[in-house]
């Protein structure tokens, strides 16, 4: 038992507390406000407008920046508002000055929400954070989004 736990690969590190709202960086869009959602979302979601698909490429706009990238899949999101078809893309992601490489986002128009990004539990496990539902901006500051 001691040998097993003496190997750092066999230990879980204690998650860092974060607020339910923090600033993240999604390249090439820059710093965006994200909701850390402990619900059942299958994928993290990124706000997208003017979505146009041409074969295996997708063009969309976020934060007045338009990009074209590869579609890696599609899925049906079932929410309180009904069913919604969403495209999946991989984008570079940073949080708290750490680059996590590419993560998968579903694209959706989030105009009716206060945040451009919704992070699911899978992404939060990768970030090794636990959400304090009483707090916002524990790790980052809202000023980073301006």
Predicted regions and their residues:
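Pepsin/retropepsin-fold aspartyl endopeptidases
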Residues: 2-146
């Amino acid at each position: 038992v001691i040998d097993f736990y003496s190997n750092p690969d066999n230990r879980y590190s204690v998650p860092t507390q974060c607020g339910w709202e923090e600033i993240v960086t999604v390249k090439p869009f820059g710093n965006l406000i994200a909701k850390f959602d402990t619900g059942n979302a299958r994928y993290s979601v990124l706000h997208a407008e003017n979505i146009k698909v041409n074969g295996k490429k997708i063009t969309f706009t976020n934060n007045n920046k338009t990009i074209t990238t590869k579609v890696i899949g599609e899925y049906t999101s079932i929410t309180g508002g009904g069913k919604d078809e969403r495209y999946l893309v991989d984008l570079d992601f940073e949080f708290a000055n750490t680059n996590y490489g590419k993560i998968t986002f579903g694209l959706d128009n989030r105009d009716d929400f206060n945040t451009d990004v919704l992070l699911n539990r899978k992404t939060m496990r990768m970030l090794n954070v636990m959400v304090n539902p009483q707090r916002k901006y524990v790790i980052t500051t809202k000023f980073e989004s301006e």
